């Protein structure tokens, strides 16, 4: 194991995969049913920007008294609501979703992102995928790995893939998590501990450090990876970015090509 690999051997005083008040999904049908909810992968809010929108929307609507606003006003109001993920909180009053509500809608455990500042919580959740949607796509793995799974998780973020696998009742034997954000790493590490995971969590801070030698070392140690999974390498590709989205042409977005590089490595060894 190289020096900057951090292996966390955490105590597991409890039996099973979860904690008493947070059981795993009991059936395949439950996961599929929950996936029918709206796609909330782009939920994100910025308190500094939405304050202005709140006031504008209220003034625009109240200008018409009790009458129906003009079509162009209704269009502008709805655009602002969609843009900033606002909800109606009373007559002519809109409000931002708070981080706890975002966690709920995205399918993360309650308090998943607690412990970091509010702004960072919004950023982390805005760059995340909807957990139950991820679980739906991973459902096929449930019966294939009754003894647990080895995961190479690239651009892990706050652990959406790990949470989804756990929710399906799949034991996480070994997880190599590649993530640069310290805040996101803290969130995943805390979740790993709180859910009493029985396996090993190995943290790597830079995807460019995932070399042939290290992949060979991990595969020799674990007996291979069962799945390589990855999120968006930066907000340039995420729904939370409303300003500059250059796709794979973005400077940091080029890191996405490391995903295919690493996948080829795993398949060739």
PLM regions and their residue ranges:
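Conserved active-site and SAM-binding loop architecture
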Residues: 1-269
């Amino acid at each position: 194991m190289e020096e900057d690999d951090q292996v966390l051997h955490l105590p597991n005083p409890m039996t099973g995969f979860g904690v008493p008040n947070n059981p795993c999904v009991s059936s395949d049908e439950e996961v599929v049913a929950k996936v029918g909810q709206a796609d909330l992968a782009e939920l994100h809010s910025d308190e500094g920007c939405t304050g202005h929108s709140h006031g504008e929307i209220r003034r625009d609507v109240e200008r018409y008294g009790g009458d129906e606003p003009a079509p162009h006003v209704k269009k502008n109001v709805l655009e602002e609501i969609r843009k900033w993920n606002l909800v109606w909180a009373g007559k002519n009053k809109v409000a931002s979703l708070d981080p706890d509500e975002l966690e709920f809608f995205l399918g993360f455990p309650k308090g998943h992102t607690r412990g970091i500042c509010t702004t960072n919580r919004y950023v982390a959740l805005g760059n995340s995928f909807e957990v139950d949607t991820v679980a739906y796509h991973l459902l096929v793995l449930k019966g294939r790995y009754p003894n647990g799974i080895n995961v190479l998780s690239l651009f892990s973020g706050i652990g959406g893939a790990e949470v989804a696998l756990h929710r399906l009742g799949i034991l996480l034997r070994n997880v190599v998590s590649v993530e640069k954000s310290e805040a996101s790493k803290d969130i995943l590490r805390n979740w790993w501990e709180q859910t009493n995971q029985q396996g090993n969590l190995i943290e790597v801070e830079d995807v460019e450090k995932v070399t042939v030698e290290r992949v060979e070392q991990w595969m020799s140690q674990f007996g291979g990876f069962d799945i390589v999974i990855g999120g968006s390498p930066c907000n340039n590709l995420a729904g939370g970015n409303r300003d500059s989205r250059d796709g794979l042409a973005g400077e940091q977005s080029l890191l996405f090509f490391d995903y295919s590089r690493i996948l080829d490595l795993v398949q060739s060894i």
